[in-house]
Amino acid sequence: MSPPEPIKFTDGAAYERFMAPWSRSAGALFLDWLAPGTGRSWVDVGAGNGAFTELVLAKYAPSSVCAIDPSDAQIEAARKKISAKQVELSIGDAMALPYDSNRFDVAVMALVLFFVPDPRKGASEMLRVTKPGGIVASYTWDVMGGGIPAQPLWDEMDAMGKPAARPPSAEISRFAALKALWADLGIRDVETRELVVERTFADFDDYWLSMVVSSPSGIVGKLTGAETAELKRRLQDRLPASASGAITVHAWATAIKGRKAA
C-alpha cells in the first residue's frame, strides 16, 4: 500500500467550506484565552485564507498584522477578503520567516504547527521575531487524541484500507510535546488549554460536501464509484442525525502560550 500524499491547501474556496468554520470557532476560544490586549503588532504564521487574521482584526484592533502562508492560492483568497490597511499578506515559509528579530508583540500559529516539517524550527522562528516580553502561542487539533474534525472520515478511510494523509508532525499536537518544546526554547509563563468546539451540518449532504468533497486530501477523486458509495454508507452509519437530519461533529485542540524572556 502506497502512503497517502501530503496534505496541500491550494484551493481557497474548498478550504473555506472544509476548515474555515472550524478555524473560526477554535480561534474565537483561543483569542479569548490569549487576551493580549488591543493595539498590538501580530504575526499570523500559516495564515491560510485569513480566517484567523479576520478574528484578530475584529477582536483586538491590532496596530498591524503580518499574515504569511506558503500557498499562493490561500494568500490570494485572503486578499479577496481582507482589505484592512494594517494587514500585510505574504507568501513564505514558517521555518524561515522574512521578518527582523524582536519585531512583533504577538506571534501565533493557528492550526499550523503540526503541518510544519520541523516544529522546533517553526516555533524558534516565532520566538525570534517576537519582542522580549511578547507572546508566543499556538494551537493545533489534537490529532493524536482523535480531536481533529476529520477524525470520523479518517477512521472510516483507515477501515477501508485507504488511509488519508495526516499532518507530518502530528506528535506535536500532544500537550506534553508542546510544553516540552516551549520549555526547551526558554519561553516563560507557559500555560496550556484544551479548546472544544462543535459544528452542525444541515444534513449528511452538507457534511459530505464540506468535509469529504472539499477535503484537501482529494479523497473522492482517488476512490472508485463503489468505494465512494461504501465510504458514504460508513459515515452515515457512524454519524447520528437529529430528527431534522442535522449532524453535529465535535473536535478539540491543544493550545499553548507563553512569553519571550525580557
Predicted segment positions?
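Conserved Class I S-adenosyl-L-methionine
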Residues: P3-K8, N49-A51, A170-A262
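A short acidic, Gly/Pro-enriched loop at the edge of an enzyme's catalytic core
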Residues: M95-A107
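Conserved alpha-helix/loop element of class I SAM-dependent methyltransferases that forms part
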Residues: P21-R40, L55
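Conserved class I S-adenosyl-L-methionine
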Residues: I135-P163
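A short glycine-rich, Lys/Arg-flanked "PGG" loop and its adjoining helix->strand segment in the class I
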Residues: R120-I135
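Class I SAM-dependent methyltransferase SAM/SAH-binding core
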Residues: S41-L97, K121
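Class I SAM-dependent methyltransferase Rossmann-like catalytic core
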Residues: F9-P21
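A short SAM/SAH-binding and catalytic strip from SAM-dependent methyltransferases
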Residues: D105-P119, D142
